């Protein structure tokens, strides 16, 4: 498991799943907050960036 992004107080962690040959993405290092999966680290970063921006946007919209 390795942290691939951190921004606005949010993190994205990636874990390589060798059997399926994908990266599983999580919002924490304990692999509790599942985000999705990606076939490459570049795709994982794109998905992670989108996830963080969505979380930040929702928090900003709700006044958090």
What residue spans do the PLM features occupy?
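Stable alpha-helical structural segments in soluble proteins, enriched in small hydrophobic residues
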Residues: 44-48
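Short N-terminal "domain-start" leader segments
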Residues: 1-22
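Short arginine-rich
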Residues: 49-62
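A short, exposed loop/beta-hairpin motif centered on an aromatic-Gly-Thr core
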Residues: 28-43
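Intrinsically disordered, low-complexity regions enriched in Ser/Pro/Gly/Gln/His and often acidic
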Residues: 6-9, 43, 54
């Amino acid at each position: 498991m390795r942290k691939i992004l951190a921004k606005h107080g949010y993190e994205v962690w990636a874990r390589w799943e060798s059997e399926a040959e994908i990266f599983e993405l999580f919002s924490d290092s304990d692999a509790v907050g599942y985000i999705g999966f990606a076939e490459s680290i570049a795709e994982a970063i794109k998905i992670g960036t989108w996830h963080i921006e969505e979380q930040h946007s929702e928090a900003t919209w709700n006044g958090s």
